[in-house]
């Protein structure tokens, strides 16, 4: 890291550069306009501005069509929101496979719902601690994603994410996801109908809706047969309504679930008869 570097390098000829990995990593003073750089040959932008806490410039015009890894590109680049410009939403991200922690810990809140994410395999920590992010990303192709660990996480709570108020996130293809651990942990506003998600390959749901107070959806259609860890699933949250809780317990109790799984539904209350029967069936299966 070069914490004092802040020179005007916006006119550099970068037309043959293939990697910008960690270029401004920990360059906490850097905040120069580099939006006109030719990035057409760049394939790696891993941690490019990570911890460059002063950087807040418009990079909308960058050609990122060849970039395969963007993990932690702006991670902990705390001031970054593309200088308030929405053009970053036009980036061609079709080659990217890794978006891990891309906007973690930033002020970023730009409309990126049209990004091509068809080749992305990991979105873990992508918006973790990005407290202001609340855009509609329901149109993303998540069919290749395997890891959504802590995607919208903040341990202290206060995340504003609710998919921009749109239920479109219900259409995400999550058939290849194996971990949703802490995915919405600390998202008090999130409450979208995601009951149709394919969770058949998910093994880890630990803390998934921890402190997600607003979340109240019917999850009865979720396939939880692969889940081995669901500890503190909704701990600290208000929980589901009796209707949704009964329905969820009913759908899950009819499945051949793994033995020895602990789960916490926060403040959820089942009905005296029906819900209790479903609960007992799950307990009998080792939950």
Segments and roles (model prediction):
Residues 1-287:
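Negatively charged
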